[in-house]
Amino acid sequence: MLEQTILEKINQLEQQILVHSIMYYRLGASIWDDFMYDRKAKELQSLIEANPDEFKASILYNDFKLFSWESGYDLPLWDSHYTAVAIWLVEYHKQQGGTV
């Protein structure tokens, strides 16, 4: 299995956190519990602090440059692409018998 680069991991976490913030704040749904969100957000925060140059090269740098692990409320919750992903994930999770 190939190991992710730091930039790839930052990009992945940014996108996951944005999608799950859209689910929580806009759709009133969540497939992550608070512990999972906190774990992912703290991991991203640590990567950002330890790797500022890689962070500046990330896909969502402008949206995450003021990010704090405590909340995703100030992220771009109205982004149409990530909203579509969030809606799809909620529906998929429901179809698989999960609760949201």
Indicate residue ranges for each PLM-predicted region:
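Phosphate/adenylate-binding "loop-and-lid" substructures adjacent to NTP/NAD/dNTP-binding pockets
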Residues: M1-V100
